[in-house]
């Protein structure tokens, strides 16, 4: 199911009693540092990363929890499990604290279901230095779901996924070059491009 996380409004007080500083302090000094709480909740949330991989990029090792809704802008959700996502250091560093703007918020890795959608486009380009891969959000999606297209573009841009995927793909291509050369001879260029 889809949650409209981008509809949440920024705020500085929680129930008119706790300030954003109070909520940030609860997270920083209790949730992360008190061993009993850390072992029970923080470590459990970290274990939700499938195979230990970051659910944002699918490449890096999940090593920290990130607030999908920034705790400094949305303090009510500072210790809400739905708001805490295990991520790699690169994705955590790339995302800054920002207000979620409807129709252009990045994807929430657990609540925005896109696995069944063919949204990622990969293109192999031959250059002087070799074959490089470029990734983008499929233009076909823009025709069928403009909002999802914009959110996916924001997601790719925010987390620098084109670069991350290009590096990963180039590494994979280089490591498997003998295999691809063999397939090129067997199938020909036209059939190989269809993959």
Residue ranges and their predicted role:
Residues 1-2, 27, 120, 148-155:
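Generic hydrophobic, helix-prone segments enriched in Leu/Val/Ile
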Residues 1-5, 133-135, 139, 143, ...:
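Non-cleavable N-terminal signal-anchor transmembrane helices
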Residues 26, 30, 44, 183:
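Residues that form generic nucleotide/phosphate-binding pockets
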Residues 31-44, 66-73:
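Short Cys/His-rich Zn2+-coordinating modules
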Residues 42-64, 88:
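Short cysteine-rich loop/turn motifs with clustered Cys
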Residues 61-141:
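Glycine- and acidic-residue-rich phosphate-binding/metal-coordinating active-site segment common to enzymes
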Residues 146-195:
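C-terminal, charged low-complexity interaction regions
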């Amino acid at each position: 199911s889809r949650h409209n996380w981008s509809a949440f409004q920024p705020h500085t007080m929680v129930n008119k009693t706790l300030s954003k500083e109070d909520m940030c302090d609860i997270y920083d000094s209790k949730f992360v540092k008190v061993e009993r709480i850390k072992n029970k909740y923080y470590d459990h949330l970290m274990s939700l990363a499938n195979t230990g991989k970051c659910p944002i990029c699918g490449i890096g090792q999940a090593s920290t929890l990130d607030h999908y809704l920034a705790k400094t802008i949305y303090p009510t959700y500072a210790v809400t499990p739905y708001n805490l996502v295990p991520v790699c250091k690169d994705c955590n560093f790339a995302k800054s604290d920002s207000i979620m703007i409807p129709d252009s918020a990045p994807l929430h890795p657990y609540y925005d279901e896109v696995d069944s959608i063919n949204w990622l486009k990969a293109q192999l380009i031959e250059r002087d230095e070799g074959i490089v891969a470029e990734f983008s959000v499929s233009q076909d999606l823009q025709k069928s779901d403009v909002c999802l297209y914009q959110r996916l573009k924001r997601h790719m841009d925010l987390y620098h996924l084109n670069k991350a995927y290009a590096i990963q793909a180039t590494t994979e291509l280089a490591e498997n070059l003998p295999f691809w050369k063999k397939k090129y001879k067997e199938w020909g260029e036209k059939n190989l491009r269809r993959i």
